[in-house]
Amino acid sequence: MTGNDILLWDETLFKDLSVLEPDYLPEYFPHRDSQLNALRFALRPSLRGMRPLNCLLVGPPGTGKTSAVMKVFREVEVHAPGVVAVKVNCQIDSTRFAVISRIYRQLFGISPPNSGIAFRKLFETVVNFLVSSEKVLIVALDDLNYLCCEGHANEVMYSLLRAHEQYPGAKIGVIGIVNDASDLYCLDSRVNSVFLPEEISFLRYGEAEILDILKDRVKYGFYPKVISDDVLELVVSYVEKTGDLRVGIDLLRRSGFNAERRGSRTISSGDVEKAYEASKLLHLCRGISLLSDSEKQLLELIAKADDVKAGELYKSFHELTQLGYTRFYGMVNRLQTLNYVDADFTGKGKRGRTRIIKAKYEAEDILNCLKKG
């Protein structure tokens, strides 16, 4: 390393570190035009003071669902002062009271009383304000399946979707965000009959799309010539392995720190590999933590069994959970979609083709993540 290659103590590789933060919302949002336009169309009635169409955004983690909602919400805030758009993280706000409290805070700028107020009174305050001020409310329920896990999905959805029946003039639309439509198995007929969402699919990004998006982050996040095309291709390969674009953005950030720690003006492949080794379990564990208890139990059985036939796996799973084959089949497909398992048909079983299921990660890594919750 020559003198010109050495990064001085008061210098940095980052032109704008915020571009590489997980909550950064880029102006340029490539490869999601059809999804953005579908979402805009569904919300268009709210710009005219009408109740919008309900939506369900479906796709694996790291495919831009939440970012798409936040981008359109930002547009709504600029062009439609009569619309209130609220995003609720259902991992955090997982009860009916917590969801309405989040909406209350956005409407009034303060938190509701911690105790001594009933849900009905709180909800009435929110809806009466919307009616009297002639505002339309759009609620995005991010990770809506967590309300299912906690047993509150139906009461939350029913309260929001049927508010206009009890409070004439109330105009509320709901956007559900989930990894898989089967996550909403808990919704009953009362809710489904009024939810009737426009489903918007977010497929995994392809290799070229991942490269395009990461190039844009590199352009605005780093100074020129900090990362070469070859090193960026290595980052892309790790993103393809995990299926989560957020992994790539985090790797760029961590790799930059590694290069700075070495005092280098450029990011090396070693910086990327070191960053991935340090963070790979963080991303795996984060993803596993989002699974339902039953999905975690199934994944544990798969990890411990190595390669296992679907019939044998179902027998063990049913003994453990008492759940039926339909739920089991859906969970296997979901774990495959999330890139945790391979579940391919192979060979011949007693009654035709059989499915061999195996984990895509080291069993030890999966089990360690499951222990962490």
Swiss-Prot record:
CDD domains: HLD_clamp_RarA. Signal peptide: none annotated. GO terms for biological process: DNA replication. Pfam families: AAA_16, Cdc6_C, Cdc6_lid. HAMAP family: ORC1_type_DNA_replic_protein. Belongs to the CDC6/cdc18 family. This is ORC1-type DNA replication protein 2. It comes from Methanosarcina acetivorans (strain ATCC 35395 / DSM 2834 / JCM 12185 / C2A).
